[in-house]
Amino acid sequence: MAAAGSSSRFAVTCGLLSQYMRERQQPQPPVTVLEAVAEEEEEEDARTMQLFPPRAAAADGVATPSAGTAPLTIFYDGRMVVVDDVPAEKAAELMRLAGSACSPPQPAHAAALPEMPIARKASLQRFLQKRKHRITTTSEPYKKAAVASPAPEKSFAVAPVKDEPATWLGL
């Protein structure tokens, strides 16, 4: 039940985040293709020197997202949510909020976890040594029990019935 409740809370939170982002997003004027290419060339020329022309030509074909907005991907509770066109300021604010959120306290025995297999192994070794000692000291437990307390022989005198043989009656 707890897993179903947390997944519905997650879906509600993601829905609210998406709605918030849509409301806060400012409408941008449409940009023509020629203006976008001219701006991209100006930015590229200002940032890099064309030292390797073949490599620079290959880099021209790569589409880069606009500097103002980009898709935001959130991984949480085994789910992935992608929100398109998130401004950099909002992404930074979300990262700050996620960093300041309280995380579950770490257990105090977390440092002892690597030592547990060694402790188990030592415990198992002690148990096996004791078991081996018990087996070697009492290799035949039934014979020793019979030798330790010998039962007196029973001699029952049973009269044989004439129709049946008496061999099986001599216990």
Swiss-Prot record:
Assigned GO CC terms: nucleus
InterPro entries per the UniProt record, alphabetical: CCT_CS (IPR018467), TIFY/JAZ (IPR040390), Tify_dom (IPR010399)
Locus of motif Nuclear localization signal: 119-126
Pfam families assigned to the protein according to its UniProt record, in alphabetical order: Jas_motif, tify
All residue ranges annotated as the Tify domain in the record: 65-100
Motif (Jas): 117-142
Coiled-coil annotated spans: none
GO biological process terms held by the UniProt record: regulation of defense response; regulation of jasmonic acid mediated signaling pathway; response to wounding
Post-translational events: Ubiquitinated. Increase in jasmonoyl isoleucine (JA-Ile) levels mediates its degradation via COI1A-mediated proteasome pathway.
UniProt keyword annotations, A-Z: Jasmonic acid signaling pathway, Nucleus, Stress response, Transcription, Transcription regulation, Ubl conjugation
UniProt subcellular location: Nucleus
Notes concerning its domains: The jas domain (117-142) is required for interaction with COI1.
Family: Belongs to the TIFY/JAZ family.
Stated role: Repressor of jasmonate (JA) responses. May act on an initial response of JA-regulated gene expression toward drought tolerance as part of a BHLH148-TIFY11D/JAZ12-COI1A complex.
Known partners and oligomeric status: Interacts with BHLH148 and COI1A. Interacts with COI1A, COI1B and COI2 in a coronatine-dependent manner. Coronatine is an analog of jasmonoyl isoleucine (JA-Ile).
Protein name (record): Protein TIFY 11d
Record organism: Oryza sativa subsp. indica
Record gene name: TI11D
